[in-house]
């Protein structure tokens, strides 16, 4: 009896191992096709401008984080004068017109989507584009917009106090290089709302009035279903904040996974199947480093599967390739991201654990990711001097210049190491 149970346990384990292996192999293959083939020459350079500042209205979405929003407004380039703040509560922000969403306003959308929909209806706009920013997004290298119905702007998160989450973001940015290929798809697989420009006529036709917790992806999918969507990626490298803690990051990833999965019925059947396969691979990807480690450190844990071991080792190596892509994205702005490379296996597990959490226990309500005042970021981040963030002009780039003395002293303090 015990022998039968043992054989059954091995069979179940083998099925799990091979299922994860096949799913992740297919996911890795499609990522390489997207990044190396489909994304070739698809990114629009920051200086490829068809619409200038006079054609753009900026809208910054917040609940009531006046100090965070003030820094975002301060970074808007001079000459881009039509700046609006859409807030859930009345706040005061210099350099922008603040609009508070009335408490009595109701629509199908909720939370951030509700604010977006109210602004679409009530905030006057005679510009060709509305450029949406999250409350913590700092514009950079921005000269204007190219042609397109939706223009996705690239991002580079900054360190805000947690090296784990910052380096995890480096891995995410590497994986997100696939987004440069989305212009070749009928339906972009996802969108990032921290820096996204939408043609005003398209916004008014599609509206934000939809029940979702991932508003930007939901909007892009409904727009693509309504008409042939011209989706472009503009390589400006806007700076936003890495989550300040691991738990905040896990909750963020859980919401992204849950919202994308819940909205997938907006897609045609073949896109739904492709997306679901990607989501499952994403959700279970934390198992790849663990299974690979077990098969090599505990040879007797599984029957002798040489093909699997070689394949899993190659998959393991691709994780470092993704991290390398993230480092390459940051390279002109920061060399500090090289720290992510040796920590890749741990970063993969942490970065995707939130997706697994969302797979097991989906969330249905929007939650705001905690933000850190820029003055605090400048104190914590050894790559930024006081004023480099708070006085930044969004027309310029925002490189990081690492102060090694600050970097090493802060690490000594964090590990309670003191000079004699």
Protein language model annotation of sequence segments:
Residues 1, 21-54, 83-85, 89-91, ...:
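Juxtamembrane C-terminal module of membrane proteins
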Residues 39-46, 64-80:
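Short, well-formed alpha-helical segments that are part of the catalytic scaffolds
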Residues 54-59, 82, 218:
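Cell-envelope/extracellular polymer assembly enzymes that use nucleotide-activated donors
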Residues 106-123, 127, 143-211, 250, ...:
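Long helical/loop segments within the catalytic core of UDP-sugar-dependent glycosyltransferases
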Residues 125-140:
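Short beta-strand-to-loop acidic/aromatic patch adjacent to the donor-nucleotide binding site
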Residues 213-219:
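Acidic donor-binding loop at a coil-to-helix junction in glycosyltransferase catalytic cores
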Residues 221-239:
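Catalytic donor-sugar/metal-binding loop of nucleotide-sugar-dependent glycosyltransferases
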